[in-house]
Amino acid sequence: MAIKKLDDGRYEVDIRPTGRNGKRIRRKFDKKSEAVAFEKYTLYNHHNKEWLSKPTDKRRLSELTQIWWDLKGKHEEHGKSNLGKIEIFTKITNDPCAFQITKSLISQYCATRRSQGIKPSSINRDLTCISGMFTALIEAELFFGEHPIRGTKRLKEEKPETGYLTQEEIALLLAALDGDNKKIAILCLSTGARWGEAARLKAENIIHNRVTFVKTKTNKPRTVPISEAVAKMIADNKRGFLFPDADYPRFRRTMKAIKPDLPMGQATHALRHSFATHFMINGGSIITLQRILGHTRIEQTMVYAHFAPEYLQDAISLNPLRGGTEAESVHTVSTVE
């Protein structure tokens, strides 16, 4: 730790601005706030003397990761997951010094992960986590070099195949489910919620036939109206968590039995995709769907646009065959008098 509390109640700053092999600076203070201020002042002035070239930051990535974890990571909802992604990068790249994290190193990392069969989308998420870590360190004035990840081109991602349930399959699924698993399925089919978002709902999240999903993927709450029948079924006379007996592994097995050809990894999103697909088939607005699903970009929602009844219908009436199977007769009109 850069700052530790001593037995006499004081706080000691113990830092090496250029890394574990650099000059060691120690100072004791009566108040923790003074220790924190001194630490930031020392790091800033060591790295930011305008009349001198900035010294190379020789701190290892693992050391910077620990600083980030203590500062912010351990307080984030997905902190442990993000830490795991950063540690994978650290291991594959042999724990480089900060100045060694270059575009070349990142390209080598991406190539290694691809050779391991890791999808581009997963690799991009790894880089996003590392980028977020450096952003947090820079904002806290604990890192003064150039952001090593910013500007790095992400890998091109393949559009995932989306599977959805037909009306007949939905009927079979609901007939095969019971208890909280069935209630969650009905809620997801009614709102487009992710399984995890629904599973964490509490009774107080449903007011006047409106359900507010608090623990969302984007960390932004969203509210979706539901019918009175659905509200009564899932929340009537309940307190605390609405679905304490939900069993996702069991639900997944039932889903695979009903829809064996479901694309790999789509079981948890099949209900969400089914909602969005039928919403568009029934003439829903793509903008409204974006808001219901909580997508930050309309491009995410456009994958469902082709299910709309009127989608590109002009292709039928305006093509050369006019919707028929033979070319129409062409009459040439003479303009010679």
From Swiss-Prot:
Keyword Transferase in annotation: yes
Q: Active site located where? A: 194, 217, 269, 272, 295, 304
Q: Does the keyword Hydrolase apply?
A: yes
Task: Give GO terms: molecular function aspect only.
Answer: DNA binding; hydrolase activity; transferase activity
Q: Which residues form the Core-binding (CB) domain?
A: 59-138
Q: What are the residue boundaries of the Tyr recombinase domain, all occurrences included? A: 160-317
EC number of the protein: 2.7.7.-, 3.1.-.-
Name of a matching Pfam family: Phage_integrase
Give the family this protein belongs to, as stated in its UniProt record. Belongs to the 'phage' integrase family.
The function of this protein is: Integrase is necessary for integration of the phage into the host genome by site-specific recombination.
Q: Which PANTHER family match?
A: FELS-2 PROPHAGE PROTEIN, PHAGE INTEGRASE-RELATED
Q: What is this protein called?
A: Integrase
Question: In which organism is this protein found?
Answer: Escherichia phage P2
This chain is encoded by the gene named: int
